[in-house]
From Swiss-Prot:
The lineage of its organism: Eukaryota, Metazoa, Chordata, Craniata, Vertebrata. Its EC number is 3.4.21.-. This is Thrombin-like enzyme acutin. It comes from the Eukaryota. Belongs to the peptidase S1 family. Snake venom subfamily. Disulfide bonds join 8-140, 27-43, 75-232, 119-186, 151-165, 176-201. Thrombin-like snake venom serine protease. Has arginyl esterase and fibrinogen clotting activities. GO terms for cellular component: extracellular region; secretory granule. It comes from Deinagkistrodon acutus. Residues 2-225 form the Peptidase S1 domain.
Length: 234
């Protein structure tokens, strides 16, 4: 869940995808068009499904849809010994999604985000930082996009040039366990994918690390067009 947030409005997360397997919910993702979902590479798993149109895990929406992955794409130049390297996965669904009251895609960004931007985080992950407590509904919060140097200092061994740093130096609001793969939305644009953070979520001075979606737009578009040999930025 999201630390320091509140229940999302039921109409603000039509693009948010819930990943689940036999053990239950485990990650989030973002619907970018009727056939494709973007999530974190570290969310890859066997025998998972994706639910769209979900708000409460206990109260069904009449337009919820479930899909299986048909194809999964991870950067061919990813260093598999480093979990957070190129932490992005593109998934083709087994059949297209129909737009509905609670389901609609979110477009890829048209420009990179700016430091200082107010960004929205959301997910069904833990709402408590230490002993995990998972809510039935997604929580949302606003955080700030910070300068790279903040996360380079906080996570010297995890920082990548293709990542974003977002949160608050004093802590308080953050993504947490179960939010991985979900979106970071800055000024209305899909700019980041939840990747990594401090093991005690929401604790300063370590904000969250997000994969920078803008850096991967060319790779995403090439794969959707059928060029599966496309490589990701270094």
């Amino acid at each position: 869940m999201v630390i320091g947030g509140d229940e999302c409005d039921i109409n603000e997360h039509r693009f948010l995808v819930a990943f689940f397997n036999t053990t239950g919910f485990f990650c989030g993702g973002t619907l970018i068009n009727p056939e494709w979902v973007v999530t974190a590479a570290h969310c890859d798993s066997t025998n998972f499904q994706m639910q769209l149109g979900v708000h409460s895990k206990k109260v069904l929406n009449e337009d919820e849809q479930t899909r299986n992955p048909k194809e999964k794409f991870i950067c061919p130049n990813k260093n598999n010994n480093e979990v957070l390297d190129k932490d992005i996965m593109l998934i083709k669904l087994d059949k297209p999604i129909s737009n509905s009251k609670h389901i609609a895609p979110l477009s890829l960004p048209s420009s990179p985000p700016s430091v200082g931007s107010v960004c929205r985080i959301m997910g069904w992950g833990s709402i408590t930082p230490v002993k995990e407590t998972f809510p039935d509904v997604p929580y949302c919060a606003n955080i700030n996009l910070l300068d790279h140097a903040v996360c380079q200092t906080g996570y010297p061994s995890c920082w990548r040039n293709t990542t974003l740093c977002a949160g608050f130096l004093e802590g308080g609001k953050d993504t947490c366990g179960g939010d991985s793969g979900g979106p970071l939305i800055c000024n209305g644009q899909f700019q980041g994918i939840v990747s990594y953070g401090a093991h005690s979520c929401g604790q300063g001075p370590k904000p969250g690390i997000y994969t920078n979606v803008f850096d991967y737009t060319d790779w995403i578009q090439r794969n959707i067009a059928g060029n599966t040999d496309a490589t990701c930025p270094p």
